[in-house]
Design a protein with these regions (language model features):
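Positively charged n-region of N-terminal signal peptides that target proteins for export
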Residues: 1-4, 9
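A structural connector/turn signal
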Residues: 39-40, 108
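Short intrinsically disordered terminal tails
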Residues: 1, 18-20, 166
């Protein structure tokens, strides 16, 4: 938060400590070396990461760098669903169950979550339910669209924490 204090004709910008906030950018938030969008990227914080630091001119200073306050909010954008089995599938030549074509970096299949539901898969990122899968796999499972059979084989069958994007 920033406070502007006017003394006569002079204006002073005072930095104040921030309360806990959360990364809201679904694609992650870049930590920069300096408080400038053109500055070198140090790393990326995933959606839902809790951050705390001093805010000045729209930038929060955290440990090793700065993040833009445009992409943080007061409420955690994620709700933990649980630990699921995550498999992968490749392009079959047809549209997803919702009628759209599958997209790398966007599509997952799930048996019961409504189409359009966005979930965060640990270590993968945010994906959208666009397709359905075999009912025998249950509801604590999702199928990640990777688009390439070799990538799917390499992915295998993994277990990951899953969060609902609110």
């Amino acid at each position: 938060m920033e406070k502007i204090i006017m003394i006569g004709l002079a204006v002073m910008l005072i930095s104040v400590p921030a309360h806990a906030a959360y990364v809201t950018a679904e694609s992650g938030l870049c930590v920069r070396e300096k408080p400038d969008e053109e500055s070198e990227r140090v790393r990326v914080l995933p959606i839902g990461t809790e951050v705390d630091g001093e805010i000045t001119d729209g930038w929060m200073q955290i440990g090793d760098g700065y993040i833009s306050t445009d992409y943080i909010g007061d409420e955690d954008p994620l709700e933990l669903i649980g630990t699921w089995r995550v498999t992968a599938y490749a392009y079959t030549g047809s549209a997803c169950a919702n009628g759209e074509m599958p997209e790398m970096g966007r599509t997952i299949a799930h048996n019961s979550l409504p189409f359009g539901t966005r979930i965060y898969i640990e270590g993968v990122g945010v994906r959208e339910v666009m397709d359905r899968g075999p009912a025998y796999l249950g509801t604590e499972w999702c199928d990640l669209y990777l688009g390439d059979v070799a990538e799917c084989v390499n992915w295998g069958d993994q277990t990951r924490e899953i969060w609902l994007v609110k």
